[in-house]
C-alpha cells in the first residue's frame, strides 16, 4: 500500500472519529437539555413542546394528565430518530412555607462509623494493625459478638470485656450486611484494641428550606457526609435545634464559604426531629408551634421545567435576620447527573457580596416565575 493511499485512509479515519465525537457531544448536550422525568400538575392539559422547547427534538403535542398514573412520552431527534422516553408524573399542586432561617443539626449514625484503621503498639513492642484489610473506612459496625452496637460507648464497653479471642463484627458496607472476624491486639497498657478510628455523631448548622402545613420540613438542599470518609451518613436519628450565626466565612473561587454559628443543645431549643439524610438534604418533622415563631412565607412549589434564566432571590440569614438578596440564574441543566447541580447562579446583590463574597453553604434560592415579582421557591434546593 503506497503512502498516498495510507494518507487517505488516515484522513478518512480522522473524519469518522470527528463525526463520532460530534455526534456523542450532540447527544450529551440534548440529554442534558431534556430531562428523564417530569412532574406536572394533575388534571392539566400540558403542551410538552412548550415546556421543553428545542428545535431538534419533537414530542407529542399534548397529554391529558389524570389520576391514572404516570405516562411515558417518547421523543425523537429531527422527528424520526428515537432519542429517549420521558416519564411524566402527575402531582398535586403544593404550597409550602419557605424559610431561610439558620438551624442547628445533630445526627447520630446507625451503628458506629469506621473512619479509618490504625496501628497498635503491642505489649511485645511490635506494631500491628488487626483490622487492616478486613474493616474499611465508611463501614458501620452494627454489632459485636451478636450484641447490638448503637454508639461508641457501647463499643468501648464491649472492648473492655475482651479476652483476646477473635470477635465477630456485623458491618454495613454500602448497604450490604457483612459478617467479619477480627482478632484484637493487647496494647502496651494491657487493653485489647481492634485498631479502629470510629465516630457515632456529627453536628453543624445550615438553612431551613421549607415547612409544610403538617410540619414536615426540608433543609440544607444537600446531604450530610462524613468529613473523613466523604460518604453520605447513614443516620439512626437526629434533632433540629435553634441556632445563632456568629460569623460568615467568605466564599471565593473554588471555596464555597460557610455560615458559622452556635447551637445550644437543650430541650428548650429543640425545633423538631431529623428522620432522613439523603443527597437532596435532611428531612423530618418540626414542632408546629416552634415553626410559627420562624420567619416563614407561604409560596407555591414550582416544577423544575418552569425554571427560567433570569432574576432570582436568595433567602438566608447571615446576620441574625432573614433577608432576601438578588441574584441571576445564568444557566439551567434539567438532566444533570448530580441532582444538586440543576442551575448556575450568580449573586448580584452588592450587600450580600460584601457580607459573604457570594453564595455560601446553607442558602435558599428562589426564582421569579412570572416576572411580576411573585417569587416561587424550589423545594429542597439551596
Regions found by a protein language model. Give the residues of each.
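Short, Lys/Arg- and Gly-enriched loop/turn segments at beta-strand edges
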Residues: 147-158, 179, 323-326, 373
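PDZ-domain C-terminal substructure recognizer with occasional recognition of PDZ-binding tails
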Residues: 77, 86, 90-93, 156-195
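Signal peptide-directed extracytoplasmic domains
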Residues: 93-128, 172, 177-185
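Serine endopeptidase catalytic core focused on the charge-relay Asp
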Residues: 185-381
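Conserved PDZ fold ligand-binding element
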Residues: 130-153, 369-371, 382
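Extracellular Ig-like/FN3 beta-sandwich strand-entry sites
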Residues: 68-72, 164-166, 307-309
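Hydrophobic membrane-insertion alpha-helices, especially the h-region
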Residues: 8-25
Amino acid at each position: 500500500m503506497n503512502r498516498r493511499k495510507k494518507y487517505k485512509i488516515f484522513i478518512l479515519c480522522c473524519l469518522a472519529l470527528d463525526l463520532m465525537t460530534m455526534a456523542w457531544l450532540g447527544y450529551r448536550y440534548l440529554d442534558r437539555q431534556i430531562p428523564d422525568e417530569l412532574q406536572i400538575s394533575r388534571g392539566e392539559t400540558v403542551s410538552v413542546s412548550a415546556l421543553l422547547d428545542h428545535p431538534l427534538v419533537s414530542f407529542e403535542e399534548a397529554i391529558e394528565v389524570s389520576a391514572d398514573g404516570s405516562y411515558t412520552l417518547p421523543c425523537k431527534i429531527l422527528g424520526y430518530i428515537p432519542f429517549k422516553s420521558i416519564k411524566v408524573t402527575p402531582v398535586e399542586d403544593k404550597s409550602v412555607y419557605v424559610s431561610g432561617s439558620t438551624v442547628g443539626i445533630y445526627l447520630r449514625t446507625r451503628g458506629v462509623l469506621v473512619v479509618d484503621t490504625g496501628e497498635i503498639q503491642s505489649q511485645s513492642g511490635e506494631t500491628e494493625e488487626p483490622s487492616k484489610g478486613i474493616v474499611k473506612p465508611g463501614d458501620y459496625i452494627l454489632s459485636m459478638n451478636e450484641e447490638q452496637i448503637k454508639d461508641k460507648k457501647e463499643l468501648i464497653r464491649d472492648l473492655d470485656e475482651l479476652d483476646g479471642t477473635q470477635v465477630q463484627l456485623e458491618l454495613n458496607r454500602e448497604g450490604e450486611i457483612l459478617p467479619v472476624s477480627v482478632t484484637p491486639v493487647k496494647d502496651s497498657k494491657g487493653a485489647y484494641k481492634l485498631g479502629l478510628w470510629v465516630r457515632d455523631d456529627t453536628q453543624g448548622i445550615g438553612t431551613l428550606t421549607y415547612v409544610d402545613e403538617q410540619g414536615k420540613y426540608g433543609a440544607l438542599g444537600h446531604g450530610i457526609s462524613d468529613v473523613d470518609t466523604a460518604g453520605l451518613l447513614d443516620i439512626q436519628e437526629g434533632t433540629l435545634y435553634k441556632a445563632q450565626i456568629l460569623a460568615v466565612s467568605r466564599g471565593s473561587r473554588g471555596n464555597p464559604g460557610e455560615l458559622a454559628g452556635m447551637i445550644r443543645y437543650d430541650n428548650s431549643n429543640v425545633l423538631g426531629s431529623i428522620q432522613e439524610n439523603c443527597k437532596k438534604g435532611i428531612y423530618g418533622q418540626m414542632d408546629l408551634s416552634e415553626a410559627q415563631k420562624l420567619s416563614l412565607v407561604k409560596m407555591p412549589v414550582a416544577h423544575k421545567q418552569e425554571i427560567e434564566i433570569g432574576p432570582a432571590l436568595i433567602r438566608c440569614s447571615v446576620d441574625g435576620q432573614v433577608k432576601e438578596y438578588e441574584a441571576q440564574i445564568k444557566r439551567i441543566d434539567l438532566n444533570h447527573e448530580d441532582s444538586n447541580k440543576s442551575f448556575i447562579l450568580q449573586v448580584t446583590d452588592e450587600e450580600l457580596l460584601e457580607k459573604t463574597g457570594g453564595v455560601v453553604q446553607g442558602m435558599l434560592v428562589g426564582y421569579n416565575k412570572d416576572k411580576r415579582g411573585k417569587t416561587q421557591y424550589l423545594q429542597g434546593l439551596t
